[in-house]
């Protein structure tokens, strides 16, 4: 054990001496990390579902209503959380109307004659929950319950309905797809492994600090999307899976502190480097049905996404190379919106909020 601590001390001091050497040789860059500001930004945009009592209460009410109102003729149900709630990557929406995604597994075989048409169960759920204090709509992937105040939406809950093979709720599940105006080809039970998706993504990171940085980076991208992309066809789950596939944790070599700016820059550049020969970004679900999460984006929307990612990359590089944290944060605020804090000029110095990297470090 003593030998270990001696070795650790020598290595750490060697690192410090090496950085001092590079500094004297002018082979090192002084840069603003803005880590404090990134973490403050994260605290502002973080959606803490368990702290959102009204939304949590409405979720519990809906689940209880379904248990109470559905007749005994309807197959047994099991509920589970999915989406950003289960991944802990949710953000406060810019214009309000936060949501929770709930999965409902009905213990029925999708080939059962009574439930071959997935719209049957969707209509049963809609009719059970349709009361005067909310609107309930059947959408292609789910049933959406929306709560209004003065005619404006304040919360919504998406209920994704599943059946299970052979009526075994632990077996393969199938998502009820289609709405009442869908064509016959669009109404189907689609094979889906939504329950497994959360574990696949989060189990990739065994280091808790890496997992926390992953979640922060996903939230930054989501808020950036809300600020910069006007179209809804860039799904948040696509950005989350892009991070799952391409994210690399980044921590200071000497101090061990997180460097979210560099981790985000690396991810954005990796996304751009993965643009295909068809001038599109393809990101596939890592579980069945392995769909391309960006397939519904038009070519113009895809072009817009690429252009704005290129701009984000350029701004992140400029902020990285900016020695003054105040100036760096002004650049970042233009990308991430008013919730990104900019410290007073008098509060920032090169020594207080900056880090060092060897010159020529790749973006």
Segments from the language model and where they lie:
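Terminal (often C-terminal) interaction modules
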Residues: 2-6, 10-24, 28-40, 279-363
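N-terminal regions immediately upstream of nucleotidyltransferase
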Residues: 2-97, 106-120, 362-363
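Conserved catalytic core of two-metal-ion nucleotidyltransferases
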Residues: 53, 66-70, 87, 119-173
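Extended hydrophobic secondary-structure segments that form protein cores and membrane-embedded regions
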Residues: 78-83, 144-146, 239-240
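Extended, alpha-helix-rich binding/interface surfaces that flank or overlap catalytic cores
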Residues: 91, 153-219, 357-359, 363
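Glycine-rich, often proline-containing surface loops adjacent to acidic residues and nearby aromatics
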Residues: 98-107, 194-202, 219, 240
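Extracellular structured ligand-interaction cores
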Residues: 101, 140-142, 154-158, 218, ...
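Conserved nucleotidyltransferase catalytic core and NTase-mimicking acidic/glycine-rich helix/loop elements
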Residues: 209-322, 327
């Amino acid at each position: 054990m003593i030998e270990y601590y001696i070795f650790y001390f020598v290595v750490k001091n060697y690192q410090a001496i090496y950085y001092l050497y590079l500094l004297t040789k002018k082979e090192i860059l002084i840069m603003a990390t803005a880590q404090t500001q990134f973490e403050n930004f994260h605290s502002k945009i973080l959606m803490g579902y368990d702290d959102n009592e009204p939304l949590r209460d409405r979720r519990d009410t809906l689940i209880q209503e379904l248990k109470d109102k559905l007749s005994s003729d309807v197959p047994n149900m099991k509920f589970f959380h999915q989406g950003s709630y289960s991944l802990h990557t949710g953000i406060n929406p810019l214009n309000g109307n936060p949501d929770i995604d709930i999965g409902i597994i009905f213990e029925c075989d999708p080939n059962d004659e009574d439930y071959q048409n997935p719209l049957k169960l969707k209509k049963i759920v809609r009719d059970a929950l349709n009361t005067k204090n909310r609107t309930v709509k059947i959408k292609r992937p789910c049933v959406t319950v929306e709560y209004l105040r003065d005619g404006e939406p304040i919360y919504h809950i998406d209920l994704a309905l599943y059946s299970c093979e052979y009526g075994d709720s632990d077996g393969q599940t199938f998502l009820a797809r289609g709405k009442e105006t869908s064509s016959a080809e669009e109404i189907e039970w689609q094979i889906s492994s939504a329950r497994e998706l959360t574990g696949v993504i989060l189990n990739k990171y065994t280091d808790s600090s890496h997992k926390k940085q992953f979640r922060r980076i996903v939230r930054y991208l989501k808020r950036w999307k809300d600020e910069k992309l006007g179209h809804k066809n860039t799904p948040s789950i696509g950005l989350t899976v892009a991070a799952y596939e391409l994210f690399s944790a980044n921590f200071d070599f000497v101090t061990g502190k997180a460097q979210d700016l560099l981790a985000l820059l690396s991810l954005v550049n990796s996304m751009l480097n993965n643009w295909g020969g068809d001038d599109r970004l393809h990101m596939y679900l890592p579980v069945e049905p392995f769909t391309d999460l960006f397939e519904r984006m038009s070519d113009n929307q895809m072009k817009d996404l690429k252009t704005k990612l290129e701009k984000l990359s350029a701004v992140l590089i400029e902020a990285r190379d900016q020695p003054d944290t105040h100036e760096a944060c002004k650049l970042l605020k233009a990308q991430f919106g008013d919730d990104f804090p900019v410290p007073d000029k008098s509060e920032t110095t090169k020594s207080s909020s900056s880090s060092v990297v060897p010159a020529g470090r790749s973006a």
